């Protein structure tokens, strides 16, 4: 479990939420959960979050709804997590997994045994009962015995029970080459990525252009809500969603927002 933050940040600070996330990221680095490159990735994401106004755009909400419908329709959905995801949204990952089939797979670009075990500990310390009762399964550490075709890096190592046989994979904060490789395997890929121009965003089936800790609670909300819908309704939500159009609309949204910013707001 992540320990108490080293820096006391007053809740009145205008950057409170952002600073708290930075503290979590730094702590995850100290605990061996995060690779140093994860700090850079987080900073890059913050930049794009500023551009969208640090709130969930209506365009992103449409992607979240489509993602929720696709996850419910899936026969074997898997949530893929890396160090950044565990640092920022471990609670939400587990909550969503429990609404689905419980499968969470650890998949690291900078894969070391030490990082794998650190992430495994983070789940075991906080969700021991859920693991022991089978409500969630943490895959990809001791059972990463399959390889994604045409992906030579260690990132291609996956669990047969998890990503290798999944039909839908939720990949928060994913790399473009891996997202593309998963799509080429015939899988539906749901990405959470603040950069609408990234390869991940462009290659995925559904891209949620939003900050992880805002998007995940909304995704959980709509998964719970959409379970009451029939299959035909869910299929229509997915079929009506156009990822390329959604990304274009998001880029237009950012451009329009920047154009309309007043000097006072700047």
Swiss-Prot record:
InterPro entries: PPS/PS, PPS/PS_sf
Gene3D superfamilies: Phosphopantoate/pantothenate synthetase (3.40.50.12640)
Nucleus found in the keyword field: no
Catalytic activity, as annotated: (R)-4-phosphopantoate + beta-alanine + ATP = (R)-4'-phosphopantothenate + AMP + diphosphate + H(+)
Organism placement in taxonomy: Archaea, Methanobacteriati, Methanobacteriota, Methanomada group, Methanococci
Function: Catalyzes the condensation of (R)-4-phosphopantoate and beta-alanine to 4'-phosphopantothenate in the CoA biosynthesis pathway.
Record keywords, A-Z: ATP-binding, Coenzyme A biosynthesis, Ligase, Nucleotide-binding
One of the Pfam families matching this protein, by short name: PPS_PS
Positions that bind ATP: 22, 44, 193-195, 199-200
Name of the protein described by the UniProt record: 4-phosphopantoate--beta-alanine ligase
PANTHER family in the record: 4-PHOSPHOPANTOATE--BETA-ALANINE LIGASE
Summary of subunit composition and partner proteins: Homodimer.
GO BP: any one term: coenzyme A biosynthetic process
One term of GO molecular function: ATP binding
Family the UniProt entry places it in: Belongs to the archaeal phosphopantothenate synthetase family.
EC code(s) of this entry: 6.3.2.36
Protein's organism: Methanocaldococcus jannaschii (strain ATCC 43067 / DSM 2661 / JAL-1 / JCM 10045 / NBRC 100440)
UniProt enzyme class: ligase
Pathway stated in the Swiss-Prot or TrEMBL entry: Cofactor biosynthesis; coenzyme A biosynthesis
């Amino acid at each position: 479990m992540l320990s108490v933050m080293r820096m006391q940040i007053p809740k009145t600070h205008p950057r409170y939420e952002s600073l708290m996330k930075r503290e979590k990221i730094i702590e995850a680095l100290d605990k061996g959960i995060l690779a140093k490159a994860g700090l850079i990735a987080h900073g890059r994401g913050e930049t794009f979050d500023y551009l969208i106004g640090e709130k969930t755009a209506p365009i992103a909400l449409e992607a979240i709804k489509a993602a929720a419908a696709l996850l419910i329709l899936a026969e074997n959905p898997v949530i893929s997590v890396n160090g950044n995801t565990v640092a920022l949204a471990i609670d939400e990952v587990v909550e969503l997994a429990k609404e689905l089939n419980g499968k969470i797979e650890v998949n690291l670009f900078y894969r070391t045994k030490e990082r794998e075990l650190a992430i495994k500990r983070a789940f075991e310390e906080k969700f021991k009962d859920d693991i022991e009762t089978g409500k969630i399964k943490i895959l990809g550490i001791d059972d990463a015995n399959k390889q994604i075709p045409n992906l030579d890096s260690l990132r291609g190592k996956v669990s047969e029970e998890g990503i290798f046989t999944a039909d839908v994979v939720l990949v928060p904060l994913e790399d473009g080459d891996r997202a593309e490789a998963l799509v080429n395997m015939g899988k539906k890929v749901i990405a959470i990525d603040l950069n609408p121009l990234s390869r991940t965003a462009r290659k995925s089936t559904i891209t949620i252009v939003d900050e992880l800790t805002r998007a995940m609670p909304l995704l959980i909300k709509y998964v719970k809500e959409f379970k009451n819908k029939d299959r035909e309704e869910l299929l229509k939500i997915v079929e009506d969603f156009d990822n390329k159009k959604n990304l274009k609309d998001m880029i237009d949204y950012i451009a329009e927002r920047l154009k309309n910013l007043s000097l006072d707001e700047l």
